[in-house]
């Protein structure tokens, strides 16, 4: 995991397996089926990285050989909240890693001005819960900012929100950081820039279309 001095709340997950899988996802010749499988796999690996600092406590259990005090995640419950539609492909890997996690959904699309339009919010109970929001791309940053706005307006504090993405543009990370400097953002890659159509360069194309096999 490495940092970028420009963006204090950004962590880049540079594990070799994550980078290897991301390269295959970027390849335009990767099939929809393979892209979907890679998205699940890379999200599982990224989930392992971002949860490494969850606090632990101990619980008394009995093993086949006798009693012991064993570590378990302390206090906070976990929830996975994909940003529709492409975020759904990331939730599978996270739930595989954390089977007890609750699942919510935030539906957002970008209008002609690349501004977020909300059409759905479904969340589990918020009390004493850490939320992992996921969306493959942070391009302009507006959808990510809006998704975090949804959580904070409902009283979820910054420290209980983690945002997970595969690829981000510096422009989007800057927007996100200005809006939510206390929310941690985790990505597999910070790419070069946005083009005139607000696509990430070099990016991986439209993640939703590649995941579902649709045309934009």
UniProtKB/Swiss-Prot annotation:
Binds 1 Mg(2+) ion per subunit. The magnesium is bound as Mg-PRPP. One of its GO terms (molecular function) is magnesium ion binding. It comes from the Bacteria. InterPro entries: PRibTrfase_dom, PRTase-like, Upp_B, UPRTase/APRTase, Ura_phspho_trans. It catalyses: UMP + diphosphate = 5-phospho-alpha-D-ribose 1-diphosphate + uracil. Its EC number is 2.4.2.9. Pathway: Pyrimidine metabolism; UMP biosynthesis via salvage pathway; UMP from uracil: step 1/1. Its cofactor is Mg(2+). Allosterically activated by GTP. The keyword Nucleotide-binding applies. Uracil binds at residues 200, 205-207. The keyword Transcription regulation does not apply. Keywords: Allosteric enzyme, Glycosyltransferase, GTP-binding, Magnesium, Nucleotide-binding, Transferase. Catalyzes the conversion of uracil and 5-phospho-alpha-D-ribose 1-diphosphate (PRPP) to UMP and diphosphate. This is Uracil phosphoribosyltransferase. It comes from Ralstonia pickettii (strain 12J).
